[in-house]
C-alpha cells in the first residue's frame, strides 16, 4: 500500500457544533469547546492549473459535522473504508460548483445532502485562479429546500455561479470530467452521440461544440429549404400544366355563354306567353259563369208554387191524423174489455182442469197405498222366516274381550313407535339444519380462500399451477408440504397485513415450505424441470422456532407504543411459522403505533432493536463498526395486496370434522328411522286384522235383535197405512158439482164477449177509411216533395257550378296579375313603367284594365309554350355539353398566370438562400470536422497505447453512417481483452463490469493528457476489476496524472492493492471515521511522520 509523504494532507473529518469560519485561511474548530484552535492544514506544493480545486470545506454535510480537505495539484488518491465519507467529498464538489443533485444519482432534492437532524448545511470550494482564487460558498436550507450562494463572501445568484464555473471550463454534469460512484455504470450506457458531445465539451476547443450545434441547425435548415424548394418546384410545374389545359376551357366557356344568353331570352319570353294563355282562359271562364248565374235565377223562381201546395197538404194531413188517433183510442178501450172477458173464461177453464187433476191424484194415491201395504206384508213374512231358520246365538263375549285386549296392546305399541318416529324426525331435522349451517360456513371459507387463490393466479400464474399440482399429488411426499406462505398465513386483523407483506419478501411469500429435503427435490424436479414452472421452495428448520420466546418482553416495549410482535399478528402452520421465525425473526420484530414514530429517536437510542415498525414506516437499525453509533434508515410501508383476506384454516378443518360427524349421525338416525317405520307398518297390519275380527264378532252377536226390531217396525207401518184410507166416490161427486157451477159462469162471459167484438169491428172499419184518405194526401205530398227535391238538387248543382266558375275566374285573374308581374320583372320593368314604343309588338289588355307590353326582341322567338320549351331543351342540351366550366374560369386563369410569376420569383430566392446555407455548412464543417478528427485521433492514439500496455487492444474512432447527418456523428469505443476475440464496441451488455470499468478509466486517462478541463473526478471505478487490470490501470493513472501541465485528478477508492507505484506529485488523502478518532486539535502530522520513520528504521531486516 502507498505510504503518505510530507505532501500528504489527510482531510481529518471532525465533529463539532460550531459554525465553519468564513475566511479560507482561518482555523478549523475542534470537537471540544475548551480545546485550542487547529491551524489551517498545510497545502501541497506544486503548480495548480486554472480552475483546479485548492480547498474543500463542509459543515453538517452528509456524514460530516465539519471537515476541510486540501487536495494537491495533480493526482489525489482519496482512500477510506466504506461509509467513512469518501463519496461525500465528491458530492460536495458537485453541489459546491452549482451541480444538480441528480448528477450524483442519489437524491432529487438538495436538502437530502444535509446531515440528518440538522436544518442547515454548508459547502465551500476554493478554486485556483492566477488573478486571485475564487471561493464559492453554498448554504443549504433543509426546511425551505433552498440554497444561498456566495462568491468571495458576497451573496450572488446561482446563475452567476454557473457562469463563473463555466468560464473555467468546469462541467460537473459531463461524465467525461465528473464521474460519481452512482454514475459509473451510466458511462458505458452513453450512446456514441452522447459520448461525442461529452468529449467535445471536456477536451475540445471552446468553439468545437458550438460549431457542432451550428452544423446540426444548419443541416436541419438545409433539409427544410430543400424540401420547400422541391415542393414549390413541383407546385409550379403543376400550375403551368393546369394553365395550358385551361386555354381550351376558356374558348369553350365563351361558346357556352352564347347558348346561355339564348336560354335567358327564351326564359324571359316564356312568362309573357304563359300570361296570354291564362288571360284567354280567364275570358272563357267568365262567359260561362254569367250563363250559369242566369240558370240559377230561373230555378229559384220555379220552386215557389210547389212550396205553397206542400204547405196546404200538410194542414189536411194533420186533421186526418188527429181523427185516426181518436179511433185508435176507442179501438184500444174495446179491445181491453174483450181481453178481460177472455181472461175470465180462461181462468174458469183452468179451475175445471184443476178439479179434474186433483181427483186423478187422489185415485193414484189410493192405488199406491194398497200396493205398499201388500209389499210390507211380504217383507214381514221373509223376516219371520229368516228369524226361524237362524241358529241360536252362542256366547261370543269372551272372544270379543280377548280381541279387545289384543287391540289395545297393539295400539299402545303403535303409539309408542310413532312417538319415537317423531323424535327421530325432529333429531334428523335438527342435524340437517346444523349440517347446512356448517356447510354454509365452509363455503364462506372457500370463497375467501378462492379470493386469495385468484390473487395468486393473477400475479404468479406459475405458482398457482404448482399449487394445483401439489393438491393432486400430495401422496407422493413423505412429510408435510405447505402451500405458498401467502395462502397459509391467516391475519388476525386485516389492518396489520401491511406489516407482514413489507417484512417478508415477495419471493418467500409465494414459496412452498417443506419439512424434508427429499420432498423438496421431488417437488422441484417435477415442477421446475418437467413443467418449466418458476416457483420458490424453502425448508423449515429441523428444530422448530415457532414457539421461540422473544429476547425482550413486550411489556418492556409498551412504553414506546409497541403493541405486538409480528409473530402474534397472524396464524400459520408450524413449519411456516418456524421458517419465518428463523429467517425473518418475526418473534423479535415489534410493531408500534403513531406514538412510536413520535418517540423514534428515543426508541432507537434506548431499545437497540434491529428492526421496528411504526404505524406507516419500517425502520432498520445498524450499529457502525467505526463509531459504535446506531445508523437508522426508514421506508414507507407499501399497501398490502395479498394478506387482506383472512381464512382460518384450523377452524375450517374443525368445521369439516363436524360435518363428517353430522353425516355419520344422520346415517345412524336414518337407519333407526327406517327400522321404526317397518315396525309401525307391522303394527298397523295387526291392528287392522284385530279390528276386522272384532267387527265380525259384534255383528254375529247383534243379528237376532236386529231382525226382531225390523219385524216390529214393519207391522207398525202396516197399521199406519191401513188407517190412512180415502172415499173415492164421494170425491168424484164433489168434483162434478163444482164443474157444473163453473160452466154456467163461463156461458155468461162468452155472451158479453160477443157484443164487445162487434163494437170493436165497427171502430176498425171507420179507422181504415180515415187511413185511406191520409194515404192519398201523403202520396200527393210525396210527389210534390220529389219534384221540389229534384229542382233543389239541380239548383244546388248549378249554384256549385257557379261558385266553382267564380273561384276559377278569381284564380285566373290572380294568376294573370302574377304572370304579368313576373313578365315585367324579367324585362326589368316596374309596375307603373310604360314600355317604350320601339320595344312593343302588341298591347294586350290585362283583365283589370292595365296594359302590358313585351319587348320587340321577342318577335324572332317562338310564340307557343311547346315551341319555347322545345327550343329551351335543345339549347340547354348544347350548353350541358360544355361540362366542367364555370364563370370563374377566365378569372382563375388570369389569377394563376400572376401566381406562376410570383412563385417563380419566390423559388429563385429560396434557391439562393439554400446555396448560402450550403456554403455556411461547408465552412463550419471544415472548422469543426478537421479539428475533431485530429482530436479523436489523439484520443485513439492514447487509448490504443494504454490498451497495448495491458496486452489488450482498443481503439476510438469517429463514427457516422452519413457524412451530412451531423446529429448522428458519435465516438465509438471498441475493445478486445482476449487475443482469441475480435474488437467489439463498448456496450453495457457485451463486456463484463470490470472490463467496462477498465475501458472507462483508460478513456478518461486519454482525455486527461489532452488537459482541457481543470480537474477530473472518478469515484470507485476500480470496483469489479481483477487485480492485474487494477494494478495496470493504477500505474497508468499515476504516470498520466502526475505529468507536468496536466489537470488535477481525484481518484476515490475504498481499497488498493499492495506494492503500488508512488509519485512525488501524488497526494494521498486518507478518510477515517469512528468513535476512537484522534481529536483534530491533537493531530500532529510531523510527529506522525517521525514515529513512522522510527518504526520503519527499527524493524528487523
Swiss-Prot record:
Pfam families xref list: SMC_N
Post-translational modification summary for this protein: Sumoylated.
Signal peptide: none
Cystine pairings recorded for this chain: none
One annotated GO biological process: cellular senescence
Keywords of this entry: ATP-binding, Cell cycle, Cell division, Chromosome, Coiled coil, DNA damage, DNA recombination, DNA repair, Mitosis, Nucleotide-binding, Nucleus, Phosphoprotein, Telomere, Ubl conjugation
SUPFAM superfamilies in the cross-refs: P-loop containing nucleoside triphosphate hydrolases
Coiled coil segments of this chain: 207-440, 645-753, 780-828, 888-927
The keyword Protein biosynthesis is annotated on this UniProt entry: no
GO cellular component: cell junction; chromosome, centromeric region; chromosome, telomeric region; cytoplasm; interchromatin granule; nuclear speck; nucleus; PML body
Tissue distribution: Expressed in testis but not ovary.
Chain positions covered by the region annotation Disordered: 1-44
UniProt family annotation: Belongs to the SMC family. SMC5 subfamily.
Function: Core component of the SMC5-SMC6 complex, a complex involved in repair of DNA double-strand breaks by homologous recombination. The complex may promote sister chromatid homologous recombination by recruiting the SMC1-SMC3 cohesin complex to double-strand breaks. The complex is required for telomere maintenance via recombination and mediates sumoylation of shelterin complex (telosome) components. Required for sister chromatid cohesion during prometaphase and mitotic progression; the function seems to be independent of SMC6.
Name listed for the protein in its UniProt record: Structural maintenance of chromosomes protein 5
Phylogenetic classification of the source organism: Eukaryota, Metazoa, Chordata, Craniata, Vertebrata
Amino acid at each position: 500500500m502507498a505510504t503518505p509523504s510530507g505532501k500528504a494532507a489527510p482531510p481529518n473529518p471532525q465533529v463539532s457544533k460550531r459554525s465553519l469560519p468564513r475566511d479560507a485561511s482561518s482555523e478549523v474548530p475542534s470537537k471540544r469547546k475548551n480545546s485550542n484552535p487547529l491551524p489551517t492544514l498545510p497545502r501541497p506544493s506544486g503548480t495548480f492549473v486554472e480552475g483546479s480545486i485548492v480547498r474543500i470545506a463542509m459543515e453538517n454535510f452528509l456524514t460530516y459535522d465539519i471537515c476541510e480537505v486540501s487536495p494537491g495539484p495533480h493526482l489525489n488518491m482519496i482512500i477510506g473504508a466504506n461509509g467513512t465519507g469518501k463519496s461525500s467529498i465528491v458530492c460536495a464538489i458537485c453541489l459546491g460548483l452549482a451541480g444538480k443533485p441528480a448528477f450524483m444519482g442519489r437524491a432529487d432534492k438538495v436538502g437530502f445532502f444535509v446531515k440528518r437532524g440538522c436544518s442547515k448545511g454548508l459547502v465551500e470550494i476554493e478554486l485556483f485562479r492566477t488573478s486571485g482564487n475564487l471561493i464559492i460558498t453554498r448554504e443549504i436550507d433543509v426546511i425551505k429546500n433552498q440554497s444561498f450562494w456566495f462568491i468571495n463572501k458576497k451573496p450572488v445568484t446561482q446563475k452567476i455561479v454557473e457562469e463563473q464555473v463555466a468560464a473555467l471550463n468546469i462541467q460537473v454534469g459531463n461524465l467525461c470530467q465528473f464521474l460519481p460512484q452512482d454514475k459509473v455504470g451510466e458511462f458505458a450506457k452513453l450512446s456514441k452521440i452522447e459520448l461525442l458531445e461529452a468529449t467535445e465539451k471536456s477536451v475540445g476547443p471552446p468553439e468545437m461544440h458550438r460549431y457542432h450545434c451550428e452544423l446540426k441547425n444548419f443541416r436541419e435548415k438545409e433539409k427544410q429549404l430543400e424540401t420547400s424548394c422541391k415542393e414549390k418546384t413541383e407546385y409550379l410545374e403543376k400550375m403551368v400544366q393546369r394553365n395550358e389545359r385551361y386555354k381550351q376551357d376558356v374558348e369553350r366557356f365563351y361558346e357556352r355563354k352564347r347558348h346561355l344568353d339564348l336560354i335567358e331570352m327564351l326564359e324571359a319570353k316564356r312568362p309573357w306567353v304563359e300570361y296570354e294563355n291564362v288571360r284567354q282562359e280567364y275570358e272563357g271562364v267568365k262567359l260561362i259563369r254569367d250563363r250559369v248565374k242566369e240558370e240559377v235565377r230561373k230555378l229559384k223562381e220555379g220552386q215557389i208554387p210547389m212550396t205553397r201546395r206542400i204547405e196546404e197538404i200538410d194542414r189536411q194531413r194533420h186533421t186526418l191524423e188527429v181523427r185516426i188517433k181518436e179511433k185508435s183510442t176507442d179501438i184500444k178501450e174495446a179491445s181491453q174489455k174483450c181481453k178481460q172477458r177472455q181472461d175470465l173464461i180462461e181462468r174458469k177453464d183452468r179451475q175445471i182442469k184443476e178439479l179434474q187433476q186433483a181427483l186423478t191424484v187422489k185415485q193414484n194415491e189410493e192405488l199406491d197405498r194398497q200396493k205398499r201395504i201388500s209389499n210390507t206384508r211380504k217383507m214381514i213374512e221373509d223376516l219371520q222366516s229368516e228369524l226361524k231358520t237362524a241358529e241360536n246365538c252362542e256366547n261370543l263375549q269372551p272372544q270379543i274381550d280377548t280381541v279387545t285386549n289384543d287391540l289395545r296392546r297393539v295400539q299402545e305399541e303403535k303409539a309408542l313407535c310413532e312417538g319415537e318416529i317423531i323424535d327421530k324426525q325432529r333429531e334428523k331435522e335438527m342435524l340437517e339444519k346444523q349440517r347446512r349451517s356448517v356447510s354454509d360456513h365452509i363455503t364462506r371459507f372457500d370463497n375467501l380462500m378462492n379470493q386469495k387463490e385468484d390473487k395468486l393466479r393473477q400475479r404468479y400464474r406459475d405458482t398457482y399451477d404448482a399449487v394445483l399440482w401439489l393438491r393432486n399429488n400430495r401422496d407422493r411426499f413423505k412429510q408435510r408440504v405447505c402451500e405458498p406462505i401467502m395462502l397459509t398465513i391467516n391475519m388476525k386483523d386485516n389492518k396489520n397485513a401491511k406489516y407482514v407483506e413489507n417484512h417478508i419478501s415477495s419471493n418467500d411469500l409465494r414459496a412452498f415450505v417443506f419439512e424434508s429435503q427429499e420432498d423438496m427435490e421431488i417437488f422441484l424436479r417435477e415442477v421446475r424441470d418437467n413443467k418449466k414452472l418458476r416457483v420458490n421452495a424453502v425448508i423449515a428448520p429441523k428444530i422448530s422456532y415457532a414457539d421461540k420466546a422473544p429476547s425482550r418482553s413486550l411489556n418492556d416495549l409498551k412504553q414506546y407504543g409497541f403493541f405486538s410482535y409480528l409473530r402474534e399478528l397472524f396464524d400459520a402452520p408450524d413449519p411456516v411459522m418456524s421458517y419465518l421465525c428463523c429467517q425473518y425473526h418475526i418473534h423479535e420484530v415489534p410493531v408500534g403505533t403513531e406514538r412510536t414514530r413520535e418517540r423514534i429517536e428515543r426508541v432507537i437510542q434506548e431499545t437497540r432493536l434491529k428492526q421496528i415498525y411504526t404505524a406507516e414506516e419500517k425502520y432498520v437499525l445498524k450499529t457502525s463498526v467505526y463509531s459504535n453509533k446506531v445508523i437508522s434508515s426508514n421506508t414507507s410501508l407499501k399497501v398490502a395486496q395479498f394478506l387482506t383476506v383472512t381464512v382460518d384454516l384450523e377452524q375450517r378443518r374443525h368445521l369439516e370434522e363436524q360435518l363428517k360427524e353430522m353425516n355419520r349421525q344422520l346415517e345412524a338416525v336414518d337407519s333407526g328411522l327406517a327400522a321404526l317405520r317397518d315396525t309401525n307398518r307391522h303394527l298397523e297390519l295387526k291392528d287392522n286384522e284385530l279390528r276386522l275380527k272384532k267387527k265380525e264378532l259384534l255383528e254375529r252377536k247383534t243379528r237376532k235383535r236386529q231382525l226382531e226390531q225390523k219385524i216390529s217396525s214393519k207391522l207398525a207401518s202396516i197399521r199406519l197405512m191401513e188407517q190412512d184410507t180415502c172415499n173415492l166416490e164421494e170425491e168424484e161427486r164433489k168434483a162434478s158439482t163444482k164443474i157444473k157451477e163453473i160452466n154456467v159462469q163461463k156461458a155468461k162471459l162468452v155472451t158479453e164477449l160477443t157484443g164487445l167484438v162487434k163494437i170493436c169491428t165497427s171502430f176498425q172499419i171507420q179507422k181504415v177509411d180515415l187511413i185511406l184518405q191520409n194515404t192519398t194526401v201523403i202520396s200527393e205530398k210525396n210527389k210534390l216533395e220529389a219534384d221540389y227535391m229534384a229542382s233543389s238538387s239541380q239548383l244546388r248543382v248549378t249554384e256549385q257550378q257557379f261558385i266553382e266558375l267564380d273561384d276559377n275566374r278569381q284564380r285566373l285573374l290572380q294568376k294573370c296579375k302574377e304572370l304579368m308581374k313576373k313578365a315585367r320583372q324579367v324585362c326589368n320593368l316596374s309596375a307603373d313603367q310604360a314600355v317604350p314604343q320601339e320595344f312593343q309588338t302588341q298591347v294586350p289588355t290585362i283583365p283589370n284594365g292595365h296594359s302590358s307590353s313585351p319587348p320587340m326582341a321577342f318577335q324572332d322567338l317562338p310564340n307557343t309554350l311547346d315551341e319555347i320549351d322545345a327550343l329551351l331543351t335543345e339549347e340547354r342540351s348544347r350548353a350541358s355539353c360544355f361540362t366542367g366550366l364555370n364563370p370563374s374560369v377566365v378569372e382563375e386563369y388570369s389569377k394563376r398566370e400572376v401566381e406562376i410569376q410570383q412563385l417563380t420569383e419566390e423559388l429563385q430566392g429560396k434557391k439562393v438562400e439554400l446555396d448560402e446555407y450550403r456554403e455556411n455548412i461547408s465552412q463550419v464543417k471544415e472548422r469543426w470536422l478537421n479539428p475533431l478528427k485530429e482530436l479523436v485521433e489523439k484520443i485513439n492514439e492514447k487509448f490504443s497505447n494504454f490498451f497495448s500496455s495491458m496486452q489488450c487492444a482498443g481503439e476510438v474512432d469517429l463514427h457516422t453512417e452519413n457524412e451530412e447527418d451531423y446529429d448522428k456523428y458519435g465516438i465509438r469505443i471498441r475493445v478486445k481483452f482476449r487475443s482469441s476475440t475480435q474488437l467489439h464496441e463498448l456496450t453495457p451488455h457485451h463486456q463484463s463490469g470490470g472490463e467496462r470499468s477498465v475501458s472507462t478509466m483508460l478513456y478518461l486517462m486519454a482525455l486527461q493528457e489532452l488537459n482541457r478541463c481543470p480537474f477530473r473526478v472518478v469515484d470507485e471505478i476500480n470496483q469489479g476489476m481483477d487485480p492485474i487490470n487494477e494494478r495496470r490501470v493504477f500505474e497508468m493513472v499515476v504516470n498520466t496524472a502526475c505529468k507536468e501541465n496536466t489537470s488535477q485528478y481525484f481518484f476515490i477508492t475504498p481499497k488498493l492493492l499492495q506494492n503500488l507505484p508512488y509519485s512525488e506529485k501524488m497526494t494521498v488523502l486518507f478518510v477515517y471515521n469512528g468513535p476512537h478518532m484522534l481529536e483534530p486539535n491533537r493531530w500532529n502530522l510531523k510527529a506522525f511522520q517521525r514515529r513512522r520513520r522510527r518504526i520503519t528504521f527499527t524493524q528487523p531486516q
